[in-house]
């Protein structure tokens, strides 16, 4: 009975040891590496575990690299993994570059990957150029007609400028700027419609791929259309603005004229008041002149006759004026 218990304990210890071994040490992965001809020790895999590296993320790309004939070491791949890179994508990019006869070292490829670029896509774009389609870009010719153009840009990745080079947005913006300036320098929008290739040729000569991660191979105008008559719209807006300014100035002059008229009316009333005041003093002056003997009775009577004649003339002229006005109205 004690022998059986000891055997059971021994078997349990062996089972636990094997479970820990197969859990902590990827024996299956080690066997796969040996079968693929990759020289890697079991203790190297244990060291990866201790360094918190997932062995499969390093060993499987290493197997692919060795089978593709690449000279890569475990330490390089492990270092790239610890730096936060994508080891599998880097190895795939190196294999694709080797097949396409592109000179690309592991250090360069790892730097591109750590910079946040998709290095595999970049290698594929170096072999198979990518077409970038811009939205409709509007420009105004010198005759005031708006012209809208859509372009297709064929680019190839420039691996040497992937780190620090501008992306697709910069290429689209520069091409759009070139299209706008080319349309704007045209004397007539009809010339742009007749020869749209002049836009692509002019833009392509400007070297818009400088400082970008791409090499522009061609720029083709995919579609071109006529927009609004911007020149006529601007002239209409200017005429409307001039009209409003003239109306404002006329209103200002009218207000000044009304104010001047009111001022003159006030002056007329003021003068009339002075006349009435002066006329009120006339009887007093006559009375004083008669009292002091400065004026005789005959002089006073002559004065009365003159005033009567004046009133009569005023009445006659007023009646004549009213009659002429009635005759004009009858006509």
Curated annotation (Swiss-Prot):
Bilayer topology annotation: Multi-pass membrane protein
Its keywords, alphabetically, are: Cell membrane, Membrane, Transmembrane, Transmembrane helix
Name the InterPro entries on file.
Answer: FloA
Residues crossing the lipid bilayer are: 5-25, 27-47
Q: Where in the cell is it found?
A: Cell membrane; Membrane raft
- Predominant subcellular localization, coarse grouping: membrane
> Does the UniProt entry include the keyword Membrane?
yes
A Pfam family the protein falls into: FloA
For this UniProt entry, what's an example GO CC term?
plasma membrane
Oligomeric state and partners?
Homooligomerizes.
Summarizing the function annotation, the protein's role is: Found in functional membrane microdomains (FMM) that may be equivalent to eukaryotic membrane rafts. FMMs are highly dynamic and increase in number as cells age. Flotillins are thought to be important factors in membrane fluidity.
The record's NCBIfam families line, in alphabetical order, gives: PRK13665.1
Tell me the protein family, please: Belongs to the flotillin-like FloA family.
What name appears for this protein in its UniProt entry? Flotillin-like protein FloA
Cite the source lineage. Bacteria, Bacillati, Bacillota, Bacilli, Bacillales
* Gene behind the chain: floA
């Amino acid at each position: 009975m004690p022998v059986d218990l000891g055997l059971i304990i021994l078997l349990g210890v062996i089972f636990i040891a094997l479970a820990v071994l197969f859990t902590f040490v990827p024996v299956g992965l080690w066997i796969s590496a040996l079968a693929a001809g990759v020289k890697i020790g079991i203790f190297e895999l244990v060291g990866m575990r201790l360094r918190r590296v997932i062995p499969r993320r390093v060993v499987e790309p290493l197997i692919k690299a060795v089978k593709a004939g690449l000279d890569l070491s475990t330490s390089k791949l492990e270092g790239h993994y610890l730096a936060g890179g994508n080891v599998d994508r880097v190895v795939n990019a190196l294999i694709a570059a080797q097949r396409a006869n592109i000179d690309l070292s592991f250090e360069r490829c790892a730097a591109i990957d750590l910079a946040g670029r998709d290095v595999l896509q970049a290698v594929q774009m170096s072999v198979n150029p990518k077409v970038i389609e811009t939205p409709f870009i509007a420009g105004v010719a010198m005759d005031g007609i708006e012209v809208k153009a859509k372009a297709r840009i064929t680019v190839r990745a420039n691996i040497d400028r992937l780190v620090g080079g501008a992306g697709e947005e910069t290429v689209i913006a520069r091409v759009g700027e070139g299209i706008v300036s080319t349309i704007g320098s045209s004397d007539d929008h009809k010339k742009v419609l007749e020869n749209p290739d002049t836009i692509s040729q002019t833009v392509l000569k400007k070297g818009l791929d400088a400082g970008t991660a791409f090499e522009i191979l061609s720029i083709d105008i995919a579609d071109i259309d006529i927009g609004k008559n911007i020149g006529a719209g601007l002239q209409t807006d200017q005429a409307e603005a001039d009209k409003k300014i003239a109306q404002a100035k006329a209103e200002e002059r009218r207000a000044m004229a009304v104010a001047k008229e009111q001022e003159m009316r006030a002056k007329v009333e003021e003068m009339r008041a002075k006349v009435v005041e002066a006329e009120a003093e006339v009887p007093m002056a006559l009375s004083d002149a008669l009292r002091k003997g400065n004026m005789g009775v005959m002089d006073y009577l002559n004065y009365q006759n003159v005033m009567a004649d004046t009133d009569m003339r005023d009445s006659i002229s007023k009646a004549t004026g009213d009659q002429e006005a009635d005759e004009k109205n009858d006509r």
